[in-house]
Amino acid sequence: MNEILWSPSNEKIKNSNLFNFKTLIEKKYKINFDTDYEKLWNWSVNYNENFWSECWDFFKIQGTKGKEIIRKDEIFHKTKFFPNGKINFAKNLISKNNSELAITFRSETGFEKHIEWNKLYKKTCIFSSFLKKIGIKKNDRIAAYVPNAIETIITFLGTAKVGAIWSSCSPDFGIQGVVDRFLQIEPKILISANYYFYNGKKISLLDKIPEILKKIPSIKEVVIFNYENEKTKNPYISFDNILEENQLDEDFEEFPFDHPIYILYSSGTTGYPKCIVHGAGNALIEQMKELILHCDVKENDKLFYFTSTGWMMWNWLVAGLACKASIYLYDGSPFYKNNDCLIKYCEDHQFTLFGVAAKYIDQLKKERFDAKKYNLKNLKTITSTGSPLVKESFIYVYEKIKKDVHLGSISGGTDVVGVINICNPFNSIYAGEIQSPSLGIDVDVFDENGNSTKIGEKGELVIKKPFPSMPVMFWNDKTEDKILNAYFRKYKNIWHHGDYIQKTKNGGYIIYGRSDATLKPGGVRIGTSEIYR
């Protein structure tokens, strides 16, 4: 049995958002969960209409909820959540509109930039005005080849505000990788920066744009923002000029709950990457649930995730604004000059949540990095994702980074633009284990024949009931062959996620890697995380 590394105090449990949420449920539905997470999770999947309705209210989502919560369909992915609901995604993220800090950006060079909530609101409204002026309408696609900067978020929010569809690639994608993705969705506008830094090198993005335009004829306009405020002469539309020359557009039209908000991409290991389309309300309610109930993010918290704009954790981080938390961006190498870049950033700004990839923690462990000398007094939560966090790395975090911290190993993916197996504020942390299934997500582990495995047996991660953040569609998939092949080929009308996983006796999970990456020596399946320990 894996050892307990950390347990929340009674005070911490009672001060959590999840405790407040479950107390409201107990009173309203005359039920008692105590602080038994599994009981609460069971209720959330067995009474999922009540659960998702209560989430909308508890998170104070702005929009029209509608009376119908779930419109069921015999076909799993055709089930609709809040079918009469309407929201404006951007409005839910920028409504704080005061003079406190909303976003901080730091590049690997140490350059920092900040924006307050009221300026974020204003610039979003001006950029949306520009989009309308040049004829951008709902469902038009905006492509962004961008570093992880404040301007990236402003252009995303402006896009969402007018009902257009956002899609981003990070600068480390080569030209062909960008074209393989964006060509499929026929964007009207390309947003980019003049350059970016990585590992001490200044890399031009302007040099790559002519080739991209040659290969994607649908792009009619290019908008360029200045990285680190340094101007570079170019023939494209200046982001700074847009802000100076356009009016404030404070009209927040509400769109259907499942109106497309962004397009993400599968890895593209075989053929062209698949274009995964996510709905605005679907993504918002799922991400707010994860941040507020599972990661205990509160108003004025300081939320950081090390991510690029080509990874779904960027979308997840941006949703922190909907929780009225400040978010912190980092662009560049996490190990440039020193291995303490990110820890120092955490200390300088006193992050409350510090999110990284499992491989980052593994690298710190390998280098025997000791973070004890840093002042991380406000750090409540560390989250790790991207690959399984092995037992030894759990132990390292508690020994060398912080003893009293909630270490949340989390796992989900681009397909759900969220998290399936996740942390929670009620349970203890066991070395090597993800704490729990996500609320409202009917997680199970199946064998090859579609039967639930026993505790301790490895199998396939599945979801047995529809959930909000399923893709609303795949782009260019009129026959639905792509979406059906991606998730429903193995088990009939059951979401097959493609992770090789085991449920533990502690109520948690251990993920061993992707199902299609497991090896079978002598007929025994071995996951990638077991090979690379």
Predicted segments with their positions:
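AMP-binding/adenylate-forming catalytic core of the ANL superfamily
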Residues: 144, 169-194, 209, 347, ...
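Conserved AMP-binding/adenylation subdomain of ANL enzymes
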Residues: 284-302, 311-352, 367-369
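Conserved pre-ATP/AMP-binding loop-to-beta segment of ANL
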Residues: 99-101, 223-224, 234-238, 242-265, ...
